[in-house]
Amino acid sequence: MTAQLNKVRRAIIDGCNPAMISDLLDDLREKNVLVDSEVEHIKESNNTNRDRCRAMIDSVKKKGDDPSNILLESLVKNHKTLAKSLGLHEPPMAPVPIQEHNADTIKNKDIKGVIPCSAEEFKKIQDTQGDKIYDVRKREGRKGLALIICNEKFENLNERHGAKVDLDGMTKLLNELGYQVHPHTNLTKTEMVKVMKEFAAQEEHADSDSTFIVLMSHGDRQGVCGTDSKKTEKEKGQYEVTNLLEIDEIFSTFNNVNCSKLRNKPKVIIIQACRGENKGGLLVRDDVASPPLEDDGLHFVQREADFICFCSSTPDTVSWRDPTKGSVFITHLIEKMNEYAHCQPLGDIFLEVQSLFKDKCPNSRSQMPTQERCTLTKKFYLFPGY
């Protein structure tokens, strides 16, 4: 459908008017093709109707066949005169309508994006779960933000080939879930801290109901590597990693004291990085070194609440990454989020991801994602597209 949209692109631009553009943008936003920030950018960054129409079409084209099809279908249904002049008399062959998607009738291999939550599913969950789930703001006023930091190239460590695949995949996933993504690449430890604090201070968090923080880099048991991290041998067989963003610092940045606008709202931390040397596979590792084993006791205080952290591996184990396809963890996470975000709480979706590793990697030393420091007090449903 991208080719068909490209074929009639010029004619649509020539025939557009302000009301038509407004209608189409509203429809694309309602059907989760464009997020609020994209719609506002199209409106505010273009001075003429033709420029707005051109920007809208080009934004949709970049997203692929299904979004292009939705735009053409909207044009046929709501602007019949123009559609007829373009030869678009029938709605193009479309995927299953957004409000009719059902995980039970769609095979996993056929899922190309997030399955939206239908009105029936939303009502059923609200009726049966009630006050057991986190509040969801109405879409019209919701401004969910997501932060992604993806380090690929380092001063002293190996390049993480395949990291761009993970970055693109997570950006697409979070956009489809309704979040405005703030992506950053190749940051030093100091830059990562600065970016996190700036993100935590965003005013839009006050109008959000949740946030995602995604960190993808090399790492070890204690944290995530910056591009300036370095591994040095202190004693024989014992290593120290410098310029490491520690896990505690991530949680501290977004706790109730330092990020009050996210108080009582789910804060999801996703970490794709190695945490040690134990291994059970043959791909590329996202590790630096394994420190001596220590007691890993965690102490929660009132200031740290409503977090859920999903790490790509258990402490002291490696995390595998394919140089061309991206990391195994991120690949499976996107797959299961696409499939179940419309009907299952996030914790259950994470269990689905873990089950894939259990089934495929029975060896206890193989990679196993783990949920850590979970202080959610309710179930967190994403309700994509609703």
Curated annotation (Swiss-Prot):
Residues 22-88 form the CARD domain. It comes from the Eukaryota. InterPro entries: CARD, Caspase-like_dom_sf, Caspase_cys_AS, Caspase_his_AS, DEATH-like_dom_sf, Pept_C14, Pept_C14_caspase, Pept_C14_p10. Keywords: Cell membrane, Cytoplasm, Hydrolase, Membrane, Protease, Thiol protease, Zymogen. Disulfide bonds: none annotated. The active site is at residues 218, 274. One of its GO terms (molecular function) is cysteine-type endopeptidase activity. Its EC number is 3.4.22.36. GO terms for biological process: positive regulation of cytokine production; positive regulation of interleukin-1 beta production; protein autoprocessing; pyroptotic inflammatory response; regulation of apoptotic process; regulation of inflammatory response. It catalyses: Strict requirement for an Asp residue at position P1 and has a preferred cleavage sequence of Tyr-Val-Ala-Asp-|-. GO terms for cellular component: AIM2 inflammasome complex; IPAF inflammasome complex; NLRP3 inflammasome complex; plasma membrane. It is found in: Cytoplasm; Cell membrane. It is an enzyme of class 3 (hydrolase). The two subunits are derived from the precursor sequence by an autocatalytic mechanism. Pfam families: CARD, Peptidase_C14. Residues 1-100, 287-296 form a propeptide. CDD domains: CARD_CASP1-like (cd08325), CASc (cd00032). Belongs to the peptidase C14A family. Heterotetramer that consists of two anti-parallel arranged heterodimers, each one formed by a 20 kDa (Caspase-1 subunit p20) and a 10 kDa (Caspase-1 subunit p10) subunit. Thiol protease involved in a variety of inflammatory processes by proteolytically cleaving other proteins, such as the precursors of the inflammatory cytokines interleukin-1 beta (IL1B) and interleukin 18 (IL18) as well as the pyroptosis inducer Gasdermin-D (GSDMD), into active mature peptides. This is Caspase-1-A. The lineage of its organism: Eukaryota, Metazoa, Chordata, Craniata, Vertebrata. The gene is casp1-a.
